[in-house]
Amino acid sequence: MRVILLGAPGAGKGTQARFITEKFGIPQISTGDMLRAAVKAGSPLGQQVKGVMDSGGLVSDDIIIALIKERITEADCAKGFLFDGFPRTIPQAEALKDAGVTIDHVVEIAVDDEEIVSRIAGRRVHPASGRVYHTEHNPPKVAGKDDVTGEDLIQREDDKEETVRHRLSVYHSQTKPLVDFYQKLSAAEGTPKYHSIAGVGSVEQITAKVLSALS
């Protein structure tokens, strides 16, 4: 079971990734974790990565693909894997295909932008305890105050509407074209199978739709 999970920030990919990896006994592979592990291991590739990261550069697709090919030969990938946050661009998707890495399923968690903005921009946090509220779905007893201490709640920089909209526009320009790429590939070659799942409703409902698409 080799899966790519796509979806905008705030679409609920992380939650679904957890259910998929548990259900099928496969690891979740994120490029960030993989790059950090390579640097820590000090392999020749890892040293290359460290050099690029130390100079503030972006790690090239060639290096990332080489790391992925290395990573998926490890024992925990025997039953497959789930890619999280990769590929992000068409060149990465093409490089993955050219490298002979076969993918069985591409799952897009599709959520409307306005729904994502409302989900994220409504979050309020109590910094000291990490308690999270939501102005609509889980409001504090007193607006703007933590239920336990009565201290002020804050809105994190990442949760502000303009930040969320900026991240969504980056997603639409960079990653959304992958949806078309995999839809066309699926139609032409029959693999990977492409599924668009509406990421609205309860977590259980969405999970049921995702797992049924994969089985």
UniProtKB/Swiss-Prot annotation:
It catalyses: AMP + ATP = 2 ADP. AMP binds at residues 31, 36, 57-59, 85-88, 92, 156, 167. Pathway: Purine metabolism; AMP biosynthesis via salvage pathway; AMP from ADP: step 1/1. Residues 122-159 are annotated as: LID. InterPro entries: Adenyl_kin_sub, Adenylat/UMP-CMP_kin, Adenylat_kinase_CS, Adenylate_kinase_lid-dom, P-loop_NTPase. Its EC number is 2.7.4.3. Belongs to the adenylate kinase family. It comes from Pseudomonas paraeruginosa (strain DSM 24068 / PA7). Its main location: cytoplasm. This is Adenylate kinase. One of its GO terms (molecular function) is ATP binding. It is found in: Cytoplasm. NCBIfam families: adk, PRK00279.1-1, PRK00279.1-2, PRK00279.1-3, PRK14527.1. GO terms for cellular component: cytoplasm. Catalyzes the reversible transfer of the terminal phosphate group between ATP and AMP. Plays an important role in cellular energy homeostasis and in adenine nucleotide metabolism. GO terms for biological process: AMP salvage. ATP binds at residues 10-15, 123, 132-133, 201. It is an enzyme of class 2 (transferase). Residues 30-59 are annotated as: NMP. Keywords: ATP-binding, Cytoplasm, Kinase, Nucleotide biosynthesis, Nucleotide-binding, Transferase. Consists of three domains, a large central CORE domain and two small peripheral domains, NMPbind and LID, which undergo movements during catalysis. The LID domain closes over the site of phosphoryl transfer upon ATP binding. Assembling and dissambling the active center during each catalytic cycle provides an effective means to prevent ATP hydrolysis. HAMAP family: Adenylate_kinase_Adk. It comes from the Bacteria. Transmembrane segments: none annotated. The keyword Ribosomal protein does not apply.
